[in-house]
């Protein structure tokens, strides 16, 4: 990893805190952004963990505006500057995506992170053209987001390599669980300052950094950002033993909300854990729902014992 790269470090795919009525919880957004800044991690708003496909356009813009304002009013104590705001972009109407991306950029988002449209199965050529269209059209820098688990498509490595040379495409967040693919994608970004690799497979955060990755995107960072901040620093500063130890510890914490649950259920459970720290309530956006009171109580007790 080249620390000269503009985009690097820990980017937490932030939950979207909402009220019982399903409206954005602005106060909770502010609390979480300050919590992240204190631990020198940045947020990815409206990604998979943030229920991105369920956030309305109006709330999405309010989310970005609130996060940007909080980040600038509460800079990271470590750097003295505002943390970077990454804004997720999902959807199937490209013209609407371009408008929304520009609204986020105008509101102060630093990077737009876009998944593939998911209604139709796309050919590699169509995937490449989609990202070229976005990159050519939007006002802010673009990061590719590959997530097979939800899009049911995988952006081929050769497509990523070609897109990596587009002047407005600054990196890749890859959540696909494939070690060979990880190595191949890191090889694309290695020794380049214009394109960064972020690992979205949280359980392999340390491994990706050891291979030369630039950043990590762990959902468990919503609960323990300080552990991932330390993991990153240990990995890039020549302390692999400590990085591996932290990887093992955070993997165990992740089991509290992930084990035996669907992806959607795990996001509810993660909010329950965050509630124990006074960060947000465990309300969800439709179609996701809360867990039973008994299950929430069990999760909360485990979270308090961490």
PLM features per residue range, with description:
Residues 2-12, 16-152, 289:
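Active-site beta->alpha loop and helix N-cap motifs at the rims of alpha/beta catalytic domains
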Residues 6-16, 39-40, 220, 224-306:
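C-terminal alpha-helical cap/extension of soluble enzyme domains
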Residues 25, 29, 60, 97, ...:
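Generic structural signal for well-ordered, non-membrane alpha-helical segments
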Residues 32, 63, 130, 163, ...:
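A structural signal for short hydrophobic/aromatic patches embedded in well-ordered alpha helices
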Residues 136-137, 148-254:
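Catalytic alpha/beta core domains of metabolic enzymes, predominantly
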